Amino acid sequence: MPKDYDRSYFDRWYRDPARRVASRAALRRKAAMAVAVAEHFLGRRVRTVLDVGCGEAAWRAPIRALRPDVSYLGLDSSAYAVRRFGRSRNVRAGSFHELAALRFERPFDLVVCADVLHYVPAPELSRGLTGLAALCGGVAYLEVMTREDDPEGDLRGFLKRPAAWYRHRFSTAGFAACGSHLYLSPTLAARSTTLERAPR
């Protein structure tokens, strides 16, 4: 039976102090790190952000607090999130595997995909990564828990895959790891120095 990403789901895992796995302060720090790394490698301010599997668009506020003029687009499969936040937070309907077919006017400076990929089946993940690499012109924040970790929170549908499995797929798509769940786009990876990139 598929999960229903309705309001009660987000209440349980993102707002309930007894169950949520990350605080707002932690999210602000992640956003600041992702923006800073993207701007370092781009050599300019972040202008565009794509948030894949954005849910209620929790990343939007901390990013806009840093860069008020940023253009933010969220994609999520939750009908509730799209209905409630579509206009106010620019959240549109979309699933990870659909990224292979999506194209926009230009690539995004920062792509966020947090707490999503460890629920995505392998065939869909492989298809989506190809599209994600094409949509990312700067840096991607791909937060994933692996078999080697001890994840908390929603474990229903969690796929216990080894870190090496993800590293191989990210690398095959053209991403280069640069630490702390951050990956350089294929374009930036080609311009980076050896020690800026994590070993494959």
Placement of each model-derived feature along the sequence:
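A conserved beta-strand element that flanks and buttresses the S-adenosyl-L-methionine
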Residues: V112
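Short catalytic micro-motifs in class I SAM-dependent methyltransferases
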Residues: D115-V116
